[in-house]
Curated annotation (Swiss-Prot):
GO biological process: protein maturation
Family of this protein: Belongs to the FdhE family.
Keyword Isomerase: no
InterPro entries per the UniProt record, alphabetical: FdhE-like_sf (IPR024064), FdhE_C (IPR056796), FdhE_central (IPR056797), FdhE_N (IPR056774), Formate_DH_accessory (IPR006452)
Chief localization: cytoplasm
Subcellular location(s) per record: Cytoplasm
Name the UniProt record assigns to this protein: Protein FdhE homolog
One cellular component (GO) term of this entry: cytosol
Keywords in alphabetical order: Cytoplasm, Plasmid
Organism: Rhizobium meliloti (strain 1021) (Ensifer meliloti)
Top-level taxon of origin: Bacteria
Function per UniProt: Necessary for formate dehydrogenase activity.
A single MF term (Gene Ontology): ferric iron binding
Amino acid sequence: MSVSPVQPDPSVIGGVPKAPFVLKPNLARLFNDRASRFEALAQGSHLAPYLNFLAGITRIQSELVSALPPPEPVPADRVERARANAMPPIDRAAMGGSPDCREVLQQFFEKAEALEKPAAAAEALAQVRTADEEMLTWMIGNVMADDLPVESLAHHLYVAAAMQIQAARLAAGLDGSRLVPIRVGVCPACGGRPVASMVIGFHGAEGARYASCSCCATMWNEVRVKCLACGSTKGIGYQAVETGDEEATVKAEVCDTCNSWMKILYQNKNPSLDVVADDVASLGLDLLMKDTEYKRAGFDPFLMGY
């Protein structure tokens, strides 16, 4: 294993006149492409059982996004109030209590029964399915607060996956032009934390950097060299677990100001990268960073046990 020293990002900033601030989740492709990426990454990986399990989880997400009727959209007046006050228009606290969200949860839990899974994961799902209203509301609240109890991570994984469906559906229905920056590391659509950031190669935004919400999958434009935990543009460096750091497609962006780090993916170098799937598959980078003074700032409910 070769570890590169902390150094400035060697990549050249793309020549984009003005990248769009927000890229909304594409429901037709989001979860389907992610599932395919999980499956591809599982081939030959020592994480294959878990990656294949998450591929199954993501296939269910894709199926439900296609099968379920659209959710009640966020009211236009709420969007405008949120815009005026620099707040996200999706109410995370209220989202889990809506009837259409509860339908998503129920159908997701039912479909997850058929997944091949370890005994502990099967037991956790059974307990989630039979949870009373108070317990389910508590778990939804934890997921929406990005605060998952260590003793019940497996239970919360299922709830988080179901809530990702509902959040992405709501975010996809927003008018992206009405979203505004909130503050560093906060999704402008739902207020969630980023799982990581990505330098993209999409037409019209080549070389631009986007943070990706761990909940609703909205992507928002950020300065290329900037800490997404504290906002500092000083003391930023990069580490990788690959030979030839300049060619690495997944790196740790570290900040000496707040001693945090977050993954940055170079989709412009590898178009098949998925921010969630490749976050999980690059667990070796997390293990490397555990031996440093930096604390992970990216949030991923699928990686909370590591």
